[in-house]
Amino acid sequence: MLLQLRMRELSIDLFSISFLSTITSAIGSLATPFWGALSDESKSRKKILLIAISVALVVLPGYTIAKRAAHFFFVAAIFTFFSSAFDPISIAIFVESSKLNSNAVVSIVNAVNSLGMGMGRIVISPLLNLLSVVHVMLILFFVALTMLYFVQRTAVVPHHRYEIQRTNLQRVFSAITSKSVLKKKNLWAMYLGSFLRQLGIGGTFALIAVYLVEEVGMKKSATILLASANSLMQVPSHFLAAWMMRKVPSKYVAAFGMLTSGLGALLFVPADSTLTVLLAYAVSGFGFGTFINGATGFVIENVPVNRRAEFLGLLTSVRSFGSLFGPLLAGWLATFSFTLVFVTMGSIMIFGSIVTWVYCQR
């Protein structure tokens, strides 16, 4: 949201703002399976993660000096490529280093991520009343630097390595072409449902800051504060998902999350006050927690152990691929009506939940 606000300050058009999300999604969709596959082959996942995050942090301050849309696109492309290593590698490290059930580990990790995002938005909101968007971005950069310390302290955990050496191109596309794995319990349907859910959510939030400021009439600081409800609501939903997966198959948990995400998008249609916007954010956040835990659990249950990070990377990849098209579609639909944006995106996510529910096997 800070990038949306900064680009709007520079009088950059709505389509370019939404196109930034498309660029990050396109790069992320290719980068995440690459980093996951590379870490599966590597002796040390930690080393790969440390190198990638270090480069990403070097590039991150570039956002503060960007003046044109092309500048933002350039910084986003490089930053996204290297930062895409974090999700698949970190999840694999946590699962392999913990004695807890993998579903419990994933829920805890996701809850911590959501709590961090929620607290970040709560902190950012008052800062925007005191400082410029650029100064707030610089503060967040210095906070992000502390990540290097914690990654460095991560233990090197032995893992089942994927012994076949592949080219970089093969690392990118190996998972998506593994038909035997994707057909197991119709794993492909989970990836398709995740793609549709992310297409919808990416379109819903691609221009949300602009919508709340220019259409609803909210202050910039208020939009950030209300957005924290999305992340904070994810925290209990992560733990609820872990409990649900002990009772029902993970595919149902994921489908429920997709359905709830769709309802969250639809709630933005009548939202015209602080309370109604807060409700829409909260429902959407609740949907994410159950979706991501169910989807991640289903993937872990149905892929080879020595290709775990690769297929977790593919999950992030298809979600990024969905975010590639979502903002583009939203940018076009917004020229007609923001209501059309939210109705379309909500409907797409609900359809994704139906695909997952019907085709994924228990």
Describe the residue ranges of each PLM region.
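Cytoplasmic helix-loop-helix junction between adjacent transmembrane helices
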Residues: A77-N113, F298
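Symmetry-related core transmembrane helices of the 12-TM Major Facilitator Superfamily/SLC fold
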Residues: H135-Q152, F342-W357
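Structural signature of the two symmetry-related core transmembrane helices
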Residues: K47-P61, Y252-L266
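Central cavity-lining transmembrane alpha-helices of secondary-active solute carriers
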Residues: F19-A37, S228-L240
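Helix-loop boundary and gating motifs at the non-cytosolic
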Residues: M1-S25, W188-G193, Q198-K219
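Helix-to-loop junctions at the C-terminal end of transmembrane segments
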Residues: A31-S44, L128, S237-P249, A334
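Hydrophobic core of transmembrane alpha-helices in multi-pass small-molecule transporters
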Residues: A70-A85, F195, T276-T290
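Juxtamembrane intracellular "pre-TM" segments in multi-pass secondary transporters
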Residues: V157-L192
